[in-house]
């Protein structure tokens, strides 16, 4: 007689639930400073908190399909209407819906590396194969390689995904390279989780009107500071949206989350304040750390900074351990290019940023 384990799909057997150990650590030790998960250090605006309070009172009712917030998103992005917008329980769910819509077991997803880990997780959960194209590390810069992505295409390729700006490197890919990839006709996902920090002029959303295969994903977890509310969205051709929407779990976005999202999108002043705070902090880090011998600080258009201490003979993991002793959680980075000197930090409060700068300087003096 078979056991229940015999019925699991083969690519799921032995796999474990994704666990963000650094987030678990932060919740278990609330005195630690969270400079590791690209969260916004500023709390939601008063208008958002008012919306949460107001709509929390009708949390006993099922939500509708987010018509108001989808219309607002379409207006912001100069698209025809809410038919060009799909909303999800964070952009992680949006990726899951896209992957489910295009992938069968054995199909391939092409990504750049280093990059956001969710692409691999959702690909693996569906029995797909991830094909990684390394960025080019040259002259202390990590550069996109669009030609490398195109060369990696095979008959099994079903999705190409590029984060713009990239996480964790913080840089943008050239516009002409997006066109080059879009011209392949393959489903092309552009992850713009952090684009608000540089402004929507850097978005590739205009490609949606020209290329039916281009899909833009965004989140309100970063510049808008709603990571705990779980709200993300996709922008694409209306027919593509309609087909992917068939994968939606009914009522996938709760009432409180969608109205909090709408309040955040309408509160332009609050967004501007958060972007200004973040970008000034990026400049602060760059100015403070530029003269640390052997340390490479990659310029970032996000709310995080990638650093490389290899030139000083320092290991990223040792920096993480050193910072933790001072109450700071920074983010480790797996070795790339045979280099174990990389680590990453998230922009924090003014005090936290000062603490992080001091910790980094002290570590590199040791």
Report each predicted region and the residues it spans.
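Conserved PLP-anchoring active-site segment centered on the Schiff-base-forming lysine
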Residues: 101-122
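PLP-dependent enzyme catalytic core of the Aspartate aminotransferase-like
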Residues: 322-326, 335-366
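N-terminal "arm"/small-domain region of PLP-dependent enzymes with the aminotransferase-like
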Residues: 1-61, 72
């Amino acid at each position: 007689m078979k056991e229940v384990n015999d019925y699991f799909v083969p690519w799921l057997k032995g796999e474990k639930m994704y666990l963000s150990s650094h987030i678990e650590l932060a919740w278990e030790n609330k005195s630690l400073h969270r400079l590791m998960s690209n969260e916004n250090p500023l709390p939601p605006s008063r208008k958002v908190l008012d919306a949460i309070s107001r709509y929390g009172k009708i949390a006993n009712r099922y939500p509708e399909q987010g018509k108001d917030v989808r219309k607002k998103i379409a207006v912001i992005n100069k698209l025809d209407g809410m038919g060009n917008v799909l909303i999800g329980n964070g952009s992680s769910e949006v990726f899951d819906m896209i992957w489910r819509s295009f992938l069968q077991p054995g199909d391939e997803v092409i990504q750049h590396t280093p990059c956001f880990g969710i692409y691999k997780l959702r690909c693996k959960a569906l029995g797909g194969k991830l094909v990684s194209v390394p960025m080019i590390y040259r002259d202390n810069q990590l550069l996109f390689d669009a030609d490398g992505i195109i060369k990696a295409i095979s008959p099994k390729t079903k999705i190409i995904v590029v984060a713009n700006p990239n996480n964790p490197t913080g840089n943008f890919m050239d516009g002409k390279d997006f066109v080059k990839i879009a011209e392949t006709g393959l489903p092309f996902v552009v992850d713009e989780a952090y684009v608000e920090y540089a402004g929507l002029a850097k978005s590739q959303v205009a490609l949606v009107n020209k290329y039916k295969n281009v899909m833009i994903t965004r989140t309100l977890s970063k510049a808008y500071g709603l990571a705990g509310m779980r709200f993300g969205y996709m922008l694409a051709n209306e027919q593509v949206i309609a087909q992917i929407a068939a994968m939606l779990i009914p009522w996938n976005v709760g009432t409180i989350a969608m109205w909090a999202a709408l309040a955040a999108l309408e509160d332009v002043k609050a967004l501007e304040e958060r972007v200004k705070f973040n970008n000034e902090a990026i400049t602060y880090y760059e100015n403070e750390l530029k003269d640390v011998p052997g340390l490479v600080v990659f310029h970032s258009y996000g709310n995080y900074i990638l650093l490389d201490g290899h030139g000083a003979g320092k290991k990223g993991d040792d920096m993480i351990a050193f910072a933790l002793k001072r109450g700071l959680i920074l983010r480790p980075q797996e070795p790339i290019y045979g280099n174990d000197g990389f680590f990453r930090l998230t922009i924090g409060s003014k005090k936290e940023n000062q603490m992080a700068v001091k910790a980094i300087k002290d570590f590199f003096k040791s």
